[in-house]
Amino acid sequence: MRVLIRPNFLSNLIRYCSRGTHSHDRSLRSVLSSNMIRLYTTGMEPQLSPDLIKIMDQRLSAIEHRNAVLQKLINQPEYSPEEFSRANKELRKLRDSMLLINDLRAKQKEIDGLKSLVSESSDDKDMLDLAVGELDEAVEEEKRLQTLLLKSLLPKDEADERDCILEVRAGTGGEEASLFAMDIFRMYERYSQKKGWKFDIVDITESDMKGYKEASAAICGASVYGKLKFESGIHRVQRIPITEKSGRIHTSAISVAILPQADEVDVQLRNEDLRIDTYRSGGSGGQHANTTNSAVRIIHLPTGMMVSIQDERSQHMNRAKALKVLCARLYEIERLRIQSSRSKLRSDQIGSGDRSGRIRTYNFPQGRVTDHRVGITHHAIEDMMQGENLDMFIDALLLRQEMDAIASFSSTS
């Protein structure tokens, strides 16, 4: 297996890292540039620049101060139950960061002590060697804690933790595109199996040659959307189609969309959002007609939706029915809103389905797969189609996202 870092990746990364309006931004981006390239090729964690550590320390001090304020507030007897609950909720959010901060502060105190020991042991070689060794280990642990804290401070996308919907569609290239769509769909199925994810086929529309015009699946597992979201876009294939008599290489394209699965919609009706009127039913007469206000009309004020029920003799039963109908209608509105949002996301992700705007090229004659966003080429295409080595591209793209977040972290501080 060979992995190549293409020159355009290096130049694009340098241009990216040269952006920024402040000198410390440019310095940070320069550090990120060299570390990002090194991390792609070695899998090592990026080193933290002095500028970044200084910015992070300011954030950590603010967290420590806020934690101290909240701890003091919840111990005050005049604190109301509502304020106590809010403070406790915020403290829970700070808990993991505070554990890391406390570990970091303890390690930094240990480092200060070891530095003093080193300076005092210059005449005792054995003691000096022992102190230097412990100091080196402590410094490495400090770096590890700083890296963990930095990652904990970066903004997180709530959707990353969700399951996802995979949609694959044949684009430019006719039957060959549909055959490649089938290959890619099966690649993700094999990859999901290797990751231990649940892969449930939702729908498949076949072409005349049993390729896939469209195919979709629900993929469930830990942080599935966060791992697969970078697969969205145009995937291009270059190979000799099985229908090609003269052996010419054809270029086709398919689109892949990765959508976060929405949580089941819960319709919560607040009393202040409802206007409930009762009136006499307009039945055909008889003992209960027009004698009691059993009919119920409910208006949902935020939407103006109205439901009237007078089928039952009991006002209580009519009210329950009306609420059930109202909930069903509001649920449908929300479901359609989510569907519309997904459609927009899908459109943004896959574009027109032609070969422009491609994110990855699969060149079968040369046995290579190239991701154009990070300039990485992998020379083992058959393994790739079996669901192997996809993590190489995913991890590189996750790293790029992390570096973007770090750069944003510094520029907004």
Swiss-Prot record:
Location in or out of the cell: Mitochondrion
A matching Pfam family: RF-1
Organ and tissue specificity: Mostly expressed in seedlings, stems and adult plants, and, to a lower extent, in siliques. Barely detected in etiolated seedlings and roots.
Record note on modification: Methylation increases the termination efficiency of RF1.
Chief subcellular location: mitochondrion
Signal peptide span: none
Protein name: Peptide chain release factor 1, mitochondrial
GO cellular component: mitochondrion
SMART domains found in the cross-reference section: PCRF (SM00937)
Entry keyword Mitochondrion: yes
Keyword Mitochondrion: yes
Modified residues (N5-methylglutamine): Q287
Family: Belongs to the prokaryotic/mitochondrial release factor family.
Function noted in UniProt: Peptide chain release factor 1 directs the termination of translation in response to the peptide chain termination codons UAG and UAA in mitochondria.
UniProt entry keywords in alphabetical sequence: Methylation, Mitochondrion, Protein biosynthesis, Transit peptide
Presequence extent in this chain: 1-40
MF term (GO), any: translation release factor activity, codon specific
Organism: Arabidopsis thaliana
